[in-house]
A protein has these predicted regions:
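Left-handed beta-helix
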Residues: 2-7, 237-437, 442-461, 468, ...
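Conserved core of the sugar-phosphate nucleotidyltransferase
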Residues: 125-171, 198-265, 269-275, 295
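Short coil/turn connectors at secondary-structure junctions
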Residues: 6-8, 56-57, 80-82, 109-112, ...
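Noncatalytic nucleic-acid binding interfaces
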Residues: 480
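Short, basic, low-complexity termini and linkers enriched in Ser/Thr/Gly/Pro
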Residues: 1-3, 170-200, 506-508
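Residue-level signal for inorganic ion chemistry
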Residues: 43, 101, 120, 162, ...
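Conserved N-terminal catalytic core of the sugar/cofactor nucleotidyltransferase
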Residues: 1-12, 20-30, 35-118, 122-128, ...
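A residue-level structural signature of the nucleotidyltransferase/glycosyltransferase Rossmann-like core
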Residues: 114, 205, 231-232, 304, ...
Length: 508
């Protein structure tokens, strides 16, 4: 990090599991890594919408260590090189995550303004967002801790609320940006005067928990409340100062966590023991509700946190009957519904306000007004140790992917795809043998002390306990069918001896 105190450093929080968007979102393939609203994933959209912000530095990403290769690949596909990718061994909410990001950002004497962004939000009006960020940077430079409050358009029970306090004067030197509107609006985030606009900001009076519907209606009707977006802006040192004041135990744990961090390829792996001992808390509870320097900038930019299937339905394009559909879908007498077909035809008749989500291994059917309860299904699946809560049939790996086609107690059939030039780890299994049949491309196979090459329609056998490795030496993807047989077929029956992706040792 350069010693440029004027730089804005985006801190992208990509550690969530997105349980309310099951079955499309899974613990090992969460919603921020999915293309939910267009061809880009939520993470990619979060990063690319920052283009055009002045004094912007390369983003710092915080993610679960299980997602690291998918995060790196998605950033590579949009030609973004992050300043760092910090790997959380466990989730500890936003206050510790941002503390570690701030400590990392200040290495070498820098003290940037942090722009803290969840990786799974939708923002449609980039110009309005950039204008709010510009004003946030100026206020952050004056010592304020900024949160962005979304101007509400309906009573909402799924968000927390922020009560606006006294309006603060614009920071000297604030820019006026050109807009097409000439009307004057006072209640929202922007004052339109002629063809010039200026963001306004308020002291934070207080934060409100997620209300019930009756209270939400009262909050909205008062005109004094905004939705809590979970986006923040402050100088790194100011956040750490306030954290030291209000949650010194969190700051101490985070210092130990970063001190014990190790470099792992292009990632920074945080000290798991130190981080596990850190108290879990949000920025709101740990700092923003206690500091006297909290400022809220109202935001009208087409924001949505995509916190449920009904929220996603709201932002998607709909037909004349109010239906949002994706995939091979046929409807008759269906209205105000969201239907997603991931792997086969889905037909629906006589439905109103429903959600149907079809994937290769699970189907969700729910009333749209019950969308928040999907997380209860995921909790039940986890309690039953069902794999559908964790991953899809198709699982991405740094070398390619595999898809489970069929399985029983003592056998499993997988379709494996290995990218050109990629290879799996040198490994062995203690409880299963494997048959490999190549259906496309060329495979170089290490089997004990033997190295062989096989091509389409050829096969080989890997006995139980045999050291082996699979490589793709060709220029096209390698596809093969793997038939596993044995007493135990779990993915944790892999003992690795050499791995180019840093996954040495037993895979647990």
């Amino acid at each position: 990090m350069k010693k440029n105190h004027n730089i804005i450093l985006p801190v992208v929080l990509s550690g969530g599991s997105g349980t309310r968007l099951w079955p499309l979102s899974r613990e090992l393939y969460p919603k921020q890594l999915l293309p939910l609203v267009d061809e880009k994933t939520m993470l990619q959209n979060t990063v690319t919408r920052l283009e055009g912000i002045a004094d912007l530095g390369p983003p710092l990403i915080i993610c679960n260590e299980s997602h690291r290769f998918m995060v790196a690949e998605q950033l590579r596909l949009i030609n973004v090189r992050p300043s760092a990718v910090l790997l959380e061994p466990v989730g500890r909410n936003t206050a510790p995550a941002v503390a570690i990001a701030a400590l990392q950002a200040m290495k070498g004497g820098a003290d940037p303004v942090l722009l803290v962004l969840p990786a799974d939000h939708v923002i449609k009006d980039f110009a309005a967002f950039h204008s709010a960020v510009d004003e946030g940077a100026r206020l952050a430079n004056s010592g304020s801790l900024i949160t962005f409050g979304v101007v509400p358009d309906r009573p909402e029970t799924g968000y927390g609320y922020i009560k606006k306090g006294k309006q603060i004067k614009p920071v000297q030197g604030s820019k006026l940006t050109v807009q097409s509107s000439s009307k004057k609006r006072v209640q929202g985030s922007i004052l339109d005067i002629g063809h010039r606009t200026l963001n306004v900001a308020f002291k934070v009076d207080r934060f409100e928990e997620k209300p019930d519907l009756a209270k939400a209606k009262k909050l909205i009707s008062s005109g004094e409340y905004l939705w809590n977006s979970g986006m923040f802006m402050f100088r790194a040192s100011r956040y750490l100062d306030e954290l030291r004041r209000f949650a010194p135990d969190i700051l101490s744990s985070c210092r130990k966590t970063l001190k014990g961090a190790v470099r792992d390829l292009d990632f920074t792996r945080l000290d798991s023991e130190a981080f596990a001992g850190c108290r879990s808390d949000s920025i709101d509870y740990a700092v923003m509700e206690k500091t006297g320097c909290a400022v809220v900038i109202p935001l009208e930019a087409g924001w949505n946190d995509i916190g449920s299937w009904s929220a996603l339905w709201e932002v998607l394009q709909k037909d004349n009957d109010g239906n949002a559909v994706a995939g091979d879908v046929i409807t008759k007498d269906v209205s105000n519904s969201f239907i997603y077909a991931g792997s086969r035809l889905v037909a629906a008749i006589g439905l109103k306000g429903h959600i149907i989500i079809e994937t290769a291994d699970a189907v969700l059917v729910a009333g749209k007004d019950e969308a928040q309860k999907v997380k209860n299904i995921v909790a039940h699946l986890k309690s039953q140790k069902r794999g559908e809560a964790l991953l899809h049939r198709r699982v991405n790996r740094p070398w390619g992917s595999y898809e489970s086609i069929d399985s029983s107690d003592r056998f499993q059939v997988k379709r494996i795809t290995v990218n050109p030039g990629a290879c799996l780890s040198l490994q062995k299994h203690h409880h299963r043998a494997e048959h490999w049949i190549v259906v496309k491309g060329t495979a170089r196979i290490t089997k004990g002390s033997e190295v062989i090459t096989i091509t389409e329609n050829e096969s080989t056998y890997i006995p139980l306990g045999t050291m082996h490795r699979l490589e793709n030496p060709g220029k096209i993807p390698l596809e093969l069918i793997e038939v596993q047989s044995g007493s135990y077929l779990g993915e944790d029956d892999i003992e690795r001896f050499d791995d180019r992706y840093g996954r040495k040792g037993t895979n647990k």
